[in-house]
Amino acid sequence: MVIMGNELQLENKILKGTTTVGIKVNDGVVLAADRRASAGFFVANKMVRKVLYITDKIGITTAGSVADLQFIYDVLKNIYHYNSITKYGPISIKGIATRLANVLSATKYFPYIVQILIGGYDDQPRLFNLDYLGDITEENYVATGSGSPVAMGVLEDEYNPKMTLDEAADLAKRAVFSAIKRDSFTGTGVIVAKIHSKGHEELEFYLNKKV
């Protein structure tokens, strides 16, 4: 797609400042992201959380404008909890992703500057990638943000749909660390979330230390 004028500026804002990774395997989904927040070329915060949870079994990764991301996160939680208290019952991961895509598409002329991965486990593992225009794709593996070209190279080379959830978590960690080494807007460490049928587990990694 050719991006012109203001759209190019928006794309640059979304790409600049983070690396997030999502991987889907048979027994779950892994979401991972670095911890650095940038303001231009300035490191604004070294310990930002970019992996968030809607429920114990549904998570998201975030890239883009912090204010817009906070609003979108609230929207996603409200979508889930509203459905839960109505006759329709809990909404599926695909349903949440589709609702968010509709919101983003409806506001594309005054867009929220975000790129979101939504992943989790309902009756099966699901992983969706959404951009600020509301485009939505279901993925087996994906990387977003300024370090995504580096991270995606690692994923392309090593992803195997038959790998275990632990192997996928290790791959996601290494993909983000590869971006940290080559992308100045990605840094500090990595949060890795393993989401499966019973809930989620979260690990934090730093260059020379596991927390």
Swiss-Prot record:
Instruction: From the UniProt record, list the residues forming the propeptide.
Output: 1-17
Q: Which residues form a coiled coil?
A: none
Q: Record's superkingdom? A: Archaea
List the protein's name: Proteasome subunit beta 1
Residues forming the catalytic site: 18
Record's function text: Component of the proteasome core, a large protease complex with broad specificity involved in protein degradation.
Reaction equation(s) it catalyzes? Cleavage of peptide bonds with very broad specificity
Question: What protein family is recorded?
Answer: Belongs to the peptidase T1B family.
GO CC annotations, alphabetized? cytoplasm; proteasome core complex, beta-subunit complex
Mention any Pfam family matching this sequence.
Proteasome
Q: Activity regulation here?
A: The formation of the proteasomal ATPase PAN-20S proteasome complex, via the docking of the C-termini of PAN into the intersubunit pockets in the alpha-rings, triggers opening of the gate for substrate entry. Interconversion between the open-gate and close-gate conformations leads to a dynamic regulation of the 20S proteasome proteolysis activity.
Location comes to: Cytoplasm
Give the multimer and partner information.
The 20S proteasome core is composed of 14 alpha and 14 beta subunits that assemble into four stacked heptameric rings, resulting in a barrel-shaped structure. The two inner rings, each composed of seven catalytic beta subunits, are sandwiched by two outer rings, each composed of seven alpha subunits. The catalytic chamber with the active sites is on the inside of the barrel. Has a gated structure, the ends of the cylinder being occluded by the N-termini of the alpha-subunits. Is capped at one or both ends by the proteasome regulatory ATPase, PAN.
For this UniProt record, the keywords arranged alphabetically read as follows: Autocatalytic cleavage, Cytoplasm, Hydrolase, Protease, Proteasome, Threonine protease, Zymogen
